[in-house]
Regions:
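Conserved N-terminal beta1-alpha1 strand-loop-helix module at the mouth
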Residues: 1-237
């Protein structure tokens, strides 16, 4: 069954990057979109150089021009791009053809998430409508994602709820930012350690459980409009 994929996002310092790696993270995220956790590409490149090659490094963008996304990822030596805005399927595919890896983020409960396979991103990231807000969305909405896509679950995850999230959603991976911080952009050692440990333990327990019962189809009327805003907010906590 393998191990759950764990991504620690919002990395702003080398110390936090090395901490996450030491605790067992599989991937790191550097936020280039406007945010309290925003980092300059040259600084992210410097940190990425000090990270073991087996650890994936993603640049997180929101509504950035595809050409600029490709240039920043490749010039910074990152493993891939995470597109966290209103990027179209065409834009996402264009970027995916020019960077090593791609992750497209969708808001849980959105109409786009229900047809996420059109973006040709696998895995995809399923987040709260307000990324970085620390808010948890209705996890039952994960059932709307088309079969065959690997889901990285995000949105308000922390050490205290990641096990429940994994047990309910059974995602391929989990992503956390504000849930393991002591201040915006600065990670907390204990929180990072406990988050990863709890995620690994919960994933291990899934091997002993029967497959979940089929989830009823999501009523399209319950999905948010394609034009609904996908706002980028930051948790104050």
């Amino acid at each position: 069954m393998g191990a759950v994929f764990v991504k620690i996002c919002g990395i702003t310092t080398e110390d936090d990057a090395l901490l996450a790696v030491a605790m067992g993270a599989n991937a790191l995220g550097f936020v280039f979109a406007p945010s309290k956790r925003q980092i300059a590409p040259p600084r992210a490149a410097d940190i990425a150089k000090r990270i073991p090659s087996e650890i994936l490094t993603f640049g997180v963008f929101r509504n950035e021009s595809p050409d600029r996304v490709v240039k920043i990822v490749n010039r910074s030596g990152l493993s891939g791009a995470q597109l966290h805005g209103h990027e179209s399927a065409e834009e996402t595919i264009w970027v995916a053809d020019r960077v090593p890896r791609i992750i497209k983020a969708f808001a849980g409960g959105s109409a786009q998430a229900a047809r996420a396979n059109e973006w040709k991103s696998n895995p995809i990231l399923l987040d709260a409508p307000a990324p970085g807000s620390g808010e948890v969305f209705d996890w039952t909405m994960a059932a709307q994602v088309p079969d065959g896509l690997r889901v990285v679950l995000a949105g308000g995850l922390r050490a205290a709820n990641v096990a429940a999230a994994i047990q309910q959603v059974r995602p391929w991976g989990v992503d956390v930012s504000s849930g393991v911080e002591k201040a915006p952009g600065r990670k907390d050692v204990t929180s990072v350690k406990n988050f990863i440990a709890n995620a690994r333990a919960a994933w291990g327990e899934l091997e002993d459980l029967p497959a979940p019962a089929p989830t009823p189809a999501v009523d399209p009327a319950s999905l948010t409009s394609e034009e609904a805003p996908y706002d980028w907010r930051d948790s104050e906590s």
